[in-house]
Amino acid sequence: MKMNRTRFAALLSGSAVLLAGTAAVLTWDAQPAERHYQFRDELAQGRFAGYNEYLHMMRANQVTGEIDPAAVQAAWAQLLQTAQKTNTLNWESRGPDNHGGRTRSLLVNRNNSNIVYAGSVGGGLYRSTNGGASWNVVSDPGANQAIGSICQAANGDIYYGTGEIWLGYGGTGQNTTPNFAGRGVYKSTDGVNFVQLASTLPASNSASAAWTAVADIEAHPTDANTIFAATNGGFMKTTDGGATWTQLMSGSITDFALSAAGTIYVNQAGRTMKSTDGATFTEVSAPVVTSTSLPRRAGGRIRYSVSPQDDNYVYCVQTNGSALAAVYRSTDGGSTWSKIGQKGSNFDPLCNGVGADVYCQGIFDLFLTVSAKDKDHVWLGGITVWQWSATGGWVQSSTLNDFAGNPFYLHADSHELIVDPNNPDVIFTSNDGGVFKSNNHGATWFERNLGYNTYQYFGFGVGKDRKLLGGCQDNGTSYLDYTSVSPHGVKKVFGGDGGHSDISWLNPKVMFAETQNGNFYRSDDGGEGWATFSNALLTRTRTAGLPYSNWMMPFELWETTTDAQSQDSVSFELLPGIRSMGFGDGIKRVFKGKINHSQPAAKFIASTVQITAGALTATANANGVVSGDATGVFYEDSAYFEITFNTPPIAEIIVTCDVYLPANSSLTLKSAIGALPVRATTTSRLDVGDEFKVQDPIQSMFFVGLTSQTTATVPKMGGVFMTRDVHDFSKTPEWWQIAHLGSNVTPHYMKVSADGNHLFVSTTSGRLYRISNLLAARTLSQASVDSANAVITVTQIGNWNGRVVTGIDVDPNDPNRVAVSLGNYGNSAYVYLSTNALASVPSFTSKQGDLPMFPCYSVSFDKGNPNRLFVGSEWGMFMADNINSATPSYSEENNGMARVPVFEIEQYRTDFNYDPNNPISSPTE
C-alpha cells in the first residue's frame, strides 16, 4: 500500500522576550494601480509600538491588562512536570540561515578573536569560530532563549543574562509590557556548554520575580570571580563566580559600564553613580544643570562608555523618553562634563518620520561605544548609527538602503556595538537584522549571519512545492525557494514588519503578504513585484480616522479545482489545424511534417488542406492527394504530409487543415486561473468556428478581517470582506462585505473549512464567528451584508469574555470539528474543541488536560489521525493523541527546536503524492 507523506511546518517565535525564531518542518509517515511596486520601507511609522501592543494583547491577563510574573513562573514549573519529549515529531530547521533577527548582545573572546558570541532575544546564544563568518547555536534548546547580555571573565568563563528589560519586567510586581520573562544567568567554563546559575533562578511563585531580566552583565577586568549584573531586581554583584550575589542597589537597573580599570558608571533611576571599588558609589550627575554638569534624567534611558585607553574619558547618552536628549563627555573621570551632541534637525539617530508621523525608539534601541584606539571617537546607535570625533563632529555612518553591495548598510534598530579586544579596527554591531562586522574601524560594513537562525516570524504560508513565504518582525516578508547558496537562505521580497503570508497552490507564482496595520499586497511573479489590491470600500474606516485593523490583519486564501457551483465558464472555439514550415530558401522543394492540434481528439478533414507559400498554392482532395503548385500527400488519420513544390519557394510555407470534434470527445481547456487544465466532454459534433462553453471549476476566495466600525452616517464600516477575483491581476478585485461584527470588534485569526463553505473568524475580544453558505454567494447581491438577497449567514458561536482567540483550525475531514487556542495569562484553559461547530448553537469544551497554563497561539488537527491535536504555545509545540477524551494528555514535542512561542502551524495536507522531481506532479510555473 502506498503511503502519503504528511509534513508539518510551524512558525517559531521567541521565548523569553518577544518573538524570535525560525521556520521548521517535521515529518513522519502517515496513511493516506502599478502592479510592480517594490516596497522596502525599513521605518514604517509606529512599528515598534504596534508590535508591543500586539504581543501584549495576546499575553496579558484580559482583566488586569498585566502579566503577573507569578503566573509565568507557575506555568514554567508546570512545564517542567509535563511528559518528556517524544520522538513523534522531529523538527528540522528551515532557516533562514542567511539573515538574522534582533540581537542585543555580542562578545569577542579575549584570547581568540575567531571566537565570537551573539545573543538573540528569542533564538538563543550562538557561537562562531571563524570571526563571525558562520554560526552555531550553543544554548540549551530547553533553556531560556532570550539572551539580553553577555560577558567573559578574566579566566575565560562566559556568562549570559536572559530577559529583555526594554520590553517589560522593568521593576517588580505586574508587567504591563509584552516581553517574555528571562530566567537568570547562565555560565560556561568551556565556552560551549552552559548551566543555569541556581542563585539567579527566579522564585517560582514570587510576584517580584527577580532575575527575570538581566539587561547587562560585565566581568571585572582582573578578578575572574567578580561579576556585575544590571537586573530588574537591582544592581547585583558576585565575588564567587555566581554562586551567591549581593545587591548593591535596589530597584530596576538597566544600564552600566565597567572600565578596563574597574571603574563603574551605573544609571540608578536617572542618577549617574560612580564606583572605583565596586562597593561604594558616589553620584556624578547633578540635580541642577550647568555647563559642566551631567543632568539627572529619569523616564528614559542612559548608556555609558569608558575609553579603554584612558579611564578618565567617559561618554554618556541620555534620552528624554525615547527621543535623544543629549550626549555628554567627561575627560576627568566624571567630575565635569561637556555636551557634545543633542537632538536636532540634522542629528537625530533615535527618531524617524515627519510631523505627526515622527516616532522615536531610544529606549528600545540604543548603544554608545568609544573607540579602542581613539579616545576622542565614539559611535552612537539607534534607528541609524552615527559617529563623533573631536575633529569631525557628528557624521551618519550607516544607511538603511539594503541594496546589493551597499558597504554602508546596517539594518535598522541597533542595540550594541563592540570592539575586538585584540584588534581595535575590527568592530561588530548587532541590530534587528542580526550581526554586522567592520574590518576598518566602522568605515564600511558587511552582514555576518550565515547560520544565525534568529528571525522572528508572525505568519507563513506553504506552497504546493513546499516553498515557504513568511512574515517577520522588522524583517519584512521572506521567501524560501531553495535557490540560495546556503541550504535555507531566503530572499527578502517585501519590507516593513511582515505578518500573514500565503502562496497559491493553483499558481505558485501568485503570493500574498502584508505589512503592519492592515496593508496587504499580492504578487504574480514569485515575489519580484508587489501591488496593493484593496479599495475604497475596505479603507472607509481608515479614511474616517477610526481604528482600521489588528496590527497583523488576518487574511485567508481558499482554492479548489472542483467547484461544482461555479458560475464562471471557459469558452472554446474550434480552430483549424495549422503548421508553419518556416521560410523557403529558393533551393529546397521538398517539405515534410505533421500538423498538431491543441485538442488531441480533433479529427482532420483532408479535403480542406491548403498549402501556401506567397503566391504559390496547393490543395488536397478527400483522399489526401495534393495538387496545384505542389504535389504530394496528406494523411488524414495522422495529419502527416509530404509535399514537393514545382518551384522552390522563398516565402513562408503554411499548411492548414480544418478539423472537427465528434460528440463525446474529451477536451482540455484553460482555466482563467493560472491557465490550469479544465476537462470537458462535447455533447455534439463541433466543426471549425463552433463555440463550446463549459463550467470553470477552478475557483478561489480571499478573505480579509478588518475592525468593524459604526458611525451615524455609515453604520457598517469594516468587518470581513471577500473577493473571488484575487487571481485576476488585470484589475482591482471586486470586494464584498460579508460580515459586520459590531462596533470596534477586531478580527484576530481566520480559518476556512476545507470545502470552502464556512469561514471561522476569531477576535481580540474573545468572540468566535462562523460565516456560512459561502459557496452559494456568487454575486454582490448574494454576499453583501446590506443586501436583501444575501445568502451568507453570520453566527457568533463562541465567547471567551475578553480574551484573544489566537488560533483556529478546522478538521480537514469534518468541518463540525473546530479547535481554538486562547492567549492571556491568568486563566485555567487555553485550548477548546467543538464537535458540532456547524450546529445552530455549537458548544465548545475545554481540552486543557495536563497542558501547562500558559498562552497558546496556534492549533492544528492531524489530517491522518482524528484523535490528534497539535498546539503551538508560549514554550513550543505540544501534542495530544487523545484529544477526544475529557482530559487529554499532552507531550512536549520540541525535539530539534527550542522552547519558543509558536504562532502558526501549517500541515501539508494533500492526498496527492507530490514529487518535486517529476514534472507531471509539479505545479505549473
What are these regions (language model features)?
Residues S569-T631, E636-A663:
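Extended beta-strand solenoid/passenger and fiber regions
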Residues S13-A24:
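Hydrophobic membrane-insertion alpha-helices, especially the h-region
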